[in-house]
Design a protein with these regions (language model features):
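Conserved ABC ATPase signature
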Residues: 32, 86-96
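Conserved catalytic motifs of ABC-family nucleotide-binding domains
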Residues: 107
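Hydrophobic anchor residue at the start of the ABC signature
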Residues: 100
């Protein structure tokens, strides 16, 4: 996860995204790359407690020259009616939706999701996975998701399994299912 954002360095090999080798970039170029091309969704929502839903999402918009329309995104996220609520007035699933909104509002090429359902119950997890699927279809972002939930791999186009930091399996999923049809 941290390699794609070039937050951590690899022991060997390199990462090439859109023809750019990340390890050859200066710190300034890496910062620009992260701002323009990457959106992050974490297991812990990391929302700003004294900002409402809309303001938390706007924080991500300031990083982009090509930000999405916030009101349209709030509708997509199912949060428009909650846009003036503070994070402590939201459920865990709603907070994760805000986190996804903050990541996607800047219209990144790649959305990095680190255990986005890890702290959620089954039903809320399915809702979040459906939302990620919808965001992918609507905005065309590449989604890279890290998860320990084996069932989630079934909704992916491409599945890479790691063990101790090394790639163990690298497969194309030819039997992709929708988030709605996932079971665990």
């Amino acid at each position: 996860f941290f390699f794609f954002g070039w937050i951590d360095n690899a022991d060997s090999g390199y990462i090439n995204i859109n023809g750019d080798k990340l390890e050859d970039m200066s710190e300034k170029k890496l910062t620009q790359y992260r701002r323009k091309h990457l959106g992050y969704v974490f297991q812990m929502y990391n929302l700003i407690g004294n900002l409402n839903v809309k303001e938390n999402i706007e924080v991500g918009a300031y990083l982009s020259d090509n930000a999405l329309d916030i009101d349209d995104l709030l509708h997509t996220l199912g949060l428009y009616e909650h846009r003036y609520k503070l994070p402590n007035q939201l459920s865990g699933g709603q907070q994760q939706r805000v986190s996804i909104g903050r990541a996607i509002v800047k219209n990144p090429d790649i959305l990095l999701c680190d255990e986005p359902t890890g702290a959620l119950d089954y039903n809320t997890s399915k809702e979040i996975l459906k939302l990620i699927e919808e965001v992918n279809k609507k905005y065309g972002n590449t989604i890279i998701m890290v998860t320990h939930n084996e069932a989630i791999k079934n909704m992916a186009d491409h599945v890479i399994k790691l063990r101790d930091g090394a790639v163990r399996h690298n497969d194309i999923n030819t039997n992709k299912v929708s988030a709605e049809d996932l079971e665990w």
